[in-house]
C-alpha cells in the first residue's frame, strides 16, 4: 500500500501460513539421548554419625546412577557427621 489513501486492491484479506523450515540441521540420535534428563526420584538414606553413632536420616532427589555413586562414597571415605559432633 503506497500513497495517502488505501485502495481495496492493496488489502489482502486471506492469509495462509507458510511452511518455512526453521532449521535444516537434523539432530543425531546420540544428541537426542543426551538431551533427555534421567528420571529423578526421592531416596531416603539412613546411616550413622561417624563420631557418636547416632542415626542420621536424609532424603536426596537424584537419578538411579547418582544414588549408586552416593552409596559408593558412603562405603568409601565420605563420612557423615551429625550437627552435635561438628
UniProtKB/Swiss-Prot annotation:
Pfam family, one: E7
Residues in unnamed zinc fingers: 49-85
Subunit structure comment from the entry: Homodimer. Homooligomer. Interacts with host RB1; this interaction induces dissociation of RB1-E2F1 complex thereby disrupting RB1 activity. Interacts with host EP300; this interaction represses EP300 transcriptional activity. Interacts with protein E2; this interaction inhibits E7 oncogenic activity. Interacts with host TMEM173/STING; this interaction impairs the ability of TMEM173/STING to sense cytosolic DNA and promote the production of type I interferon (IFN-alpha and IFN-beta).
Keywords in alphabetical order: Activator, DNA-binding, Early protein, G1/S host cell cycle checkpoint dysregulation by virus, Host cytoplasm, Host nucleus, Host-virus interaction, Inhibition of host innate immune response by virus, Inhibition of host interferon signaling pathway by virus, Interferon antiviral system evasion, Metal-binding, Modulation of host cell cycle by virus, Oncogene, Transcription, Transcription regulation, Viral immunoevasion, Zinc, Zinc-finger
Recorded domain comment: The E7 terminal domain is an intrinsically disordered domain, whose flexibility and conformational transitions confer target adaptability to the oncoprotein. It allows adaptation to a variety of protein targets and exposes the PEST degradation sequence that regulates its turnover in the cell.
Name the UniProt record assigns to this protein: Protein E7
UniProt motif Nuclear export signal: location: 67-75
Compartments, as annotated in UniProt: Host cytoplasm; Host nucleus
Annotated region (E7 terminal domain), positions in chain: 1-37
Principal location class: host cell
Domain of life: Viruses
Keyword Nucleus among UniProt keywords: no
Role summary: Plays a role in viral genome replication by driving entry of quiescent cells into the cell cycle. Stimulation of progression from G1 to S phase allows the virus to efficiently use the cellular DNA replicating machinery to achieve viral genome replication. E7 protein has both transforming and trans-activating activities. Induces the disassembly of the E2F1 transcription factor from RB1, with subsequent transcriptional activation of E2F1-regulated S-phase genes. Interferes with host histone deacetylation mediated by HDAC1 and HDAC2, leading to transcription activation.
GO cellular component, one term: host cell nucleus
GO biological process: DNA-templated transcription; symbiont-mediated perturbation of host cell cycle G1/S transition checkpoint; symbiont-mediated suppression of host innate immune response; symbiont-mediated suppression of host type I interferon-mediated signaling pathway
One Gene Ontology molecular-function label: protein domain specific binding
Keyword match DNA-binding: yes
Amino acid at each position: 500500500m503506497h500513497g495517502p489513501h488505501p485502495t481495496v486492491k492493496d488489502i489482502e484479506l486471506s492469509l495462509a501460513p507458510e511452511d518455512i523450515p526453521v532449521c535444516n540441521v537434523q539432530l543425531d540420535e546420540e544428541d537426542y539421548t543426551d538431551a533427555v534428563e534421567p528420571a529423578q526420584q526421592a531416596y531416603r538414606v539412613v546411616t550413622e554419625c561417624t563420631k557418636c553413632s547416632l542415626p542420621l536420616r536424609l532424603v536426596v532427589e537424584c537419578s538411579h546412577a547418582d544414588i549408586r555413586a552416593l552409596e559408593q562414597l558412603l562405603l568409601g571415605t565420605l563420612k557423615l557427621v551429625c550437627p552435635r559432633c561438628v
